[in-house]
Amino acid sequence: MLIFLWCGAVCVSLLGAANIPPHPLNLINFMEMIRYTIPCEKTWGEYADYGCYCGAGGSGRPIDALDRCCYVHDNCYGDAEKKHKCNPKTQSYSYKLTKRTIICYGAAGTCGRIVCDCDRTAALCFGNSEYIEGHKNIDTARFCQ
């Protein structure tokens, strides 16, 4: 009886999970890189709505060094799309987290390597930039013109 209940719970759990759309693989890789480089008390999600460029879209001038990391990352993705015909949000790539740095694998000039380098540069930039609480959830209409 116990085995039947356990199997039923697993099947229901798997069926429920089947309706959840997967995150694009690259975004999962990028989140892992960010978690590796930022201070322990922060979560990657705290960077998702920061300044004028960290999060969806972006406009105006970056408001600080951390926001500039996101601005550069956005432009890097834009270049990958326009110049190299890559799709950064779904591009898979190989990398290694080691000794407080990130190593991207793959041949130079390939979409995987280009996108990995964009994410690597941004994640390391996040780790070296001050996080200012007052720059989270700012009024972008007011401060990002």
Swiss-Prot record:
First and last residue of the signal peptide: 1-17
Chain residues that bind Ca(2+): Y53, G55, G57
SUPFAM superfamilies referenced in this protein's UniProt entry, alphabetically: Phospholipase A2, PLA2
UniProt keyword terms in alphabetical order: Calcium, Disulfide bond, Hydrolase, Lipid degradation, Lipid metabolism, Metal-binding, Neurotoxin, Presynaptic neurotoxin, Secreted, Signal, Toxin
EC number: 3.1.1.4
Chemical reaction(s) catalysed: a 1,2-diacyl-sn-glycero-3-phosphocholine + H2O = a 1-acyl-sn-glycero-3-phosphocholine + a fatty acid + H(+)
Propeptide part(s) removed at maturation, as residue ranges: 18-25
Keyword Transmembrane helix listed: no
Superkingdom classification of source: Eukaryota
Stored Gene3D superfamilies: Phospholipase A2 domain
Catalytic EC class: hydrolase
Description of how the protein assembles with itself and partners: Heterodimer; disulfide-linked. The A chains have phospholipase A2 activity and the B chains show homology with the basic protease inhibitors.
Family membership: Belongs to the phospholipase A2 family. Group I subfamily. G49 sub-subfamily.
Function statement: Snake venom phospholipase A2 (PLA2) that inhibits neuromuscular transmission by blocking acetylcholine release from the nerve termini. PLA2 catalyzes the calcium-dependent hydrolysis of the 2-acyl groups in 3-sn-phosphoglycerides.
Protein name, per record: Basic phospholipase A2 beta-bungarotoxin A-AL1 chain
